[in-house]
Amino acid sequence: MIRHGSNKLKIFILSILLLTLSGCALKSSSNSEKEWHIVPVSKDYFSIPNDLLWSFNTTNKSINVYSKCISGKAVYSFNAGKFMGNFNVKEVDGCFMDAQKIAIDKLFSMLKDGVVLKGNKINDTILIEKDGEVKLKLIRGI
């Protein structure tokens, strides 16, 4: 008989299994500091600047997002299988066009709410999903 107190343990174990089986690229390795290019999949993110890069630091569980117009850092966590990060962001005033600013704001809001990451070791790609839809891809070192 399973007691309700074990649900948190089940969710934790399922999260670990999901990340392990998906080949998620957040595992500690010598490549954890490499840059990842953010590639929009959903139309809401098409205006994200081409030079916006993302890097993970698995040692202190932080993410850095940066371009010529912005720099941001967040400590990430996993909660109920969702990847979350609340960013501290610095922008260069007047550097972004309005559409870019809206897309960047949506990106940080989505990451704060939590997303599902699905990794692929073969082609060094991470899919970022929200509500069952792929919104962005992270591609390592294009």
Swiss-Prot record:
Residues 1-23 form the signal peptide. GO terms for cellular component: cell outer membrane. A lipid is attached at residue 24 (S-diacylglycerol cysteine). A lipid is attached at residue 24 (N-palmitoyl cysteine). Keywords: Cell outer membrane, Lipoprotein, Membrane, Palmitate, Plasmid, Signal, Virulence. It is a lipid-anchor. Coiled coil: none annotated. PROSITE patterns: PROKAR_LIPOPROTEIN. It comes from the Bacteria. Disruption phenotype: Inactivation of the gene blocks the Ipa invasin secretory pathway and severely attenuates virulence. InterPro entries: MxiM, MxiM_sf. The keyword Membrane applies. CDD domains: lipocalin_MxiM. It is found in: Cell outer membrane. Monomer. Interacts with the secretin MxiD/SctC. Belongs to the MxiM family. Involved in the synthesis of the type III secretion system (T3SS), also called injectisome, which is used to inject bacterial effector proteins into eukaryotic host cells. Pilot protein that is required for the proper localization of the secretin MxiD/SctC in the outer membrane. Also influences both MxiD/SctC multimerization and stability. Required for both Ipa translocation and tissue culture cell invasion. Binds lipids. This is Type 3 secretion system pilotin. It comes from Shigella flexneri.
